[in-house]
Amino acid sequence: MKIGIPKEIKNNENRVAITPAGVMTLVKAGHEVYVETEGGAGSGFSDSEYEKAGAADRCRTWRDAWTAEMVLKVKEPLAREFRYFRPGLILFTYLHLAAAERVTKAVVEQKVVGIAYETVQLANGSLPLLTPMSEVAGRMSVQVGAQFLEKPHGGKGILLGGVPGVRRGKVTIIGGGTAGTNAAKIGVGLGADVTILDINAERLRELDDLFGDHVTTLMSNSYHIAECVRESDLVVGAVLIPGAKAKLVTEEMVRSMTPGSVLVDIAIDQGGIFETTDRVTTHDDPTYVKHGVVHYAVANMPGAVPRTSTFALTNVTIPYALQIANKGYRAGCLDNPALLKGINTLDGHIVYEAVAAAHNMPYTDVHSLLHG
């Protein structure tokens, strides 16, 4: 199979969908790999490294990468990339379609086979292709939150770890999954007063065992969320419902916070969990202030640490890409239930129910199309 790797064009998106080692894996399996010129530069990979690994040396433009049978990316396509959509194109990337109506309509209209990293799901409910980026974003969330709590960045001037005789900063993390757990690790490491909320009592027990008395765990409900948000210096939104939006923090709750507090919405690429995160920001202009509260809503947080992120991402995506390339998407997905859950669009239909619901568009069962 011909596999294309275009250069990411989203603002400050320095990750790339494949490392030279990944190229070598695919080439050794008999596939052709086309990496756009300087596609890996942001992650520290040169064109010559890709060529030595077996990538075609004649790929120079977006067009060359996008004309492949399968395109591997990191982030959802931007409007100027829609021109390369065509029936049967396999697009394997983070799609986050529930929060991207324009992208959804484009892949449906052009009958693109849209396979989303974030909805590939194992039998135990875990999301193996989302996990590494959730780890990165979770750890970054408290780092950037601490930075924007500084007065020169619009914050209230709080040091999260405090100093002797001065209270520590209060951090609330909504969601105790991978991102939330990693946020807590950094918060605890900085010496902050950390509270984690989750709807799963068993998960709260696990977090209590993991962190002991270094964190407070609370059952997530509207009452506890409102109380914690009001008292916090930094709130991290780390809730993900695969393929869907999850607005948990109301505008009224945000209004109750003291001026200069900070919200970091890790889930903004899926629509976010705060009613007041009404826009997506960029690494160039990462924050805005609403009701006196600093909002950080960068949709590609791991793009700021591309070297780490690219290795972490491709470690988990390449085995699935190899399965698609070896068997084709139909057989590959039918043979692997986890990969089957990754299909969001197929033959002009939305086949992931949460995406269809998010845009009030028709839903079609994927099996009826794959077996048709």
UniProtKB/Swiss-Prot annotation:
The record's section on PROSITE patterns has: ALADH_PNT_1, ALADH_PNT_2
Q: What is its EC number?
A: 1.4.1.1
Q: Where in the cell is it found?
A: Cytoplasm
Q: What class of enzyme is it?
A: oxidoreductase
A Pfam family (short name) is AlaDh_PNT_C
Catalytic positions are H96 (proton donor/acceptor), D269 (proton donor/acceptor)
Keywords on this record? Cytoplasm, NAD, Nucleotide-binding, Oxidoreductase, Sporulation
Entry GO terms, CC: cytosol; plasma membrane
Q: Name the positions where substrate binds.
A: R15, K75
Entry binding sites for NAD(+): 134, 178-179, 198, 220, 239-240, 266-269, 279, 298-301
Q: How does activity depend on temperature?
A: Retains about 50% of its initial activity when heated at 85 degrees Celsius for 5 minutes at pH 7.2.
Function, as annotated, reads: Catalyzes the reversible reductive amination of pyruvate to L-alanine. A key factor in the assimilation of L-alanine as an energy source via the tricarboxylic acid cycle during sporulation.
Name the NCBIfam families on file. alaDH
Which protein, by its recorded name, is this? Alanine dehydrogenase
Organism the protein comes from:
Geobacillus stearothermophilus (Bacillus stearothermophilus)
- The protein's gene is named ald
